């Protein structure tokens, strides 16, 4: 009898041990699968193809399915690092430096995204309310809080790869209602209703893809792309400006009233440059919008200027320059001065020839709050410029353009773009 009891005890212990091992194995596979899927979602959703942006809507689901805060952080890191994978190479190109400089900045930039999503993962809620953390409304509310933080400064300064950008693909023309529907969809993807939400969002996605058309140009507007590499904005010679003026005059036509040139096209904006361009446009019934830099004692402003035969003025001052490479706030804090100045919530919309436009320069096209800020003022068109010579070998410019297209489609606005590569 003692032998039988001992045998049964050993059998029970072995069965329990085998059960724990099986669970551990399943958990490891689940964690690995979640991280691999987050990497795939980041790669596909942010490939630079506008119609693939809704893939990013799967990220909240993967975050919500994470079994621990650590895994939620790993899932967030996999998504964000893959979505922003062009940054290390871009930084290396910009500074003509070692790839490791870009790698360190890439990892540092991901820290905010990972920290926010890991912090809002609802571990306590799951412990207090078994089953309801994943099935109720705790996770949706917490995810929306994380999404809002990543959409607005200060975390929103590096809030790239925001799934909300997919709104324009899912609900083109629906404006703020479409944005609200996408927000609700993101929340539902973290709840027990995620299969129904995924089916509904998938239906809108396929419908949009089947009826997709590119945004139109504003009447009488034209964007001119350039391929001048890193010389654009650095070559201030008379010949350079004359060549650009010739390019503008060649692009002008009977139906063209406004021509848009890329970011930094005019280099340093001075009275001499302004007079040169006014003289060059004499007799041409056209207005030029072009990127330039304006120096002041505190640093410089990255701007859009407008110039015609009869007028020149600064049209727009960039709200959010590229952090670290352009915007270096520590220089101001230490009294050194220098770097590009950020005008966060200034000039969200500007008027030109009776048309209100939403201007976006380069980095502003990668984050959420500048375009939403602009759309509060009901602009008639979006004007997006960039100087992407440093993105060679990456998909950064394609991602910028996909984001601009998505926002233009969401709000039903025409858009004109001009990029230098």
Swiss-Prot record:
Q: Which UniProt keywords apply?
A: Cell membrane, Conjugation, Membrane, Plasmid, Transmembrane, Transmembrane helix
- Gene3D superfamilies listed in its UniProt record: Carbon-nitrogen hydrolase
Q: Which GO terms describe its cellular component?
A: plasma membrane
Q: Which residues cross the membrane?
A: 33-53, 103-123, 144-164, 169-189, 193-213, 287-307, 366-386, 388-408
User: What region holds the CN hydrolase domain?
Assistant: 222-421
* Compartments (UniProt record): Cell membrane
Q: Which domain of life is it from?
A: Bacteria
Spell out the Pfam families in the cross-references: CN_hydrolase
Topology in the lipid bilayer: Multi-pass membrane protein
Query: Which NCBIfam families is this protein grouped with?
Result: PRK13825.1-2 (NF010398)
List the protein's name: Conjugal transfer protein TraB
Task: Give the originating organism.
Answer: Agrobacterium fabrum (strain C58 / ATCC 33970)
| Name of the gene this protein is made from | traB
């Amino acid at each position: 009898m003692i032998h039988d009891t001992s045998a049964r005890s050993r059998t029970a212990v072995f069965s329990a041990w085998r059960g724990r091992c099986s669970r551990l194995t399943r958990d490891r596979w689940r964690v690995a699968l979640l991280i691999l899927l987050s990497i795939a979602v980041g790669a596909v959703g942010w490939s630079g193809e506008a119609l693939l942006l809704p893939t990013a809507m799967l990220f909240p689901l993967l975050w919500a399915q994470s079994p621990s805060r650590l895994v939620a952080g790993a899932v967030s890191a996999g998504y964000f690092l893959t979505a922003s994978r062009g940054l290390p190479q871009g930084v290396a190109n910009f500074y003509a430096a070692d790839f490791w400089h870009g790698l360190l900045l890439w990892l540092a930039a991901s820290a905010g995204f990972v920290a926010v999503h890991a912090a809002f993962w609802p571990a306590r809620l799951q412990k207090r309310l078994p089953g309801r953390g994943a099935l109720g409304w705790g996770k949706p509310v917490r995810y929306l809080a994380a999404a809002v933080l990543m959409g607005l400064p200060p975390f929103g300064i590096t809030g790239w790869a925001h799934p909300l950008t997919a709104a324009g693909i899912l609900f083109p023309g629906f404006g703020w209602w479409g944005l609200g529907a996408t927000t609700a969809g993101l929340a539902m993807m973290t709840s027990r209703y995620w299969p129904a939400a995924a089916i509904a969002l998938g239906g809108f996605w396929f419908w949009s893809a089947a009826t997709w058309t590119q945004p139109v140009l504003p009447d009488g507007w034209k964007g001119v792309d350039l391929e001048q590499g890193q010389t654009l904005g650095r070559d201030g010679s008379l010949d350079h400006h004359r060549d650009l003026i010739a390019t503008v005059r060649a692009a002008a036509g009977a139906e063209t009233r406004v021509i848009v040139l890329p970011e930094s096209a005019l280099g340093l904006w001075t009275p001499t440059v302004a007079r040169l361009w006014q003289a060059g446009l004499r007799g041409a019934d056209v207005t030029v919008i072009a990127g330039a830099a304006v120096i002041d004692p505190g640093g410089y402003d990255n701007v859009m200027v407008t110039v015609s035969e009869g007028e020149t003025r600064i049209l727009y001052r960039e709200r959010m320059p590229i952090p670290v490479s352009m915007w270096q706030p520590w220089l101001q804090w230490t009294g050194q001065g220098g770097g590009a100045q950020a005008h966060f919530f200034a000039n969200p919309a500007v008027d030109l020839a009776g048309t209100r436009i939403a201007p976006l320069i380069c980095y502003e096209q990668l984050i959420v709050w500048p375009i939403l800020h602009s759309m509060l003022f009901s602009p008639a068109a979006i004007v997006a410029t960039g100087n992407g010579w440093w993105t060679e070998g990456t998909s950064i410019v394609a991602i910028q353009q996909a984001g601009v297209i998505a926002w233009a489609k969401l709000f039903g606005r025409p858009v004109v773009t001009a990029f230098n590569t």
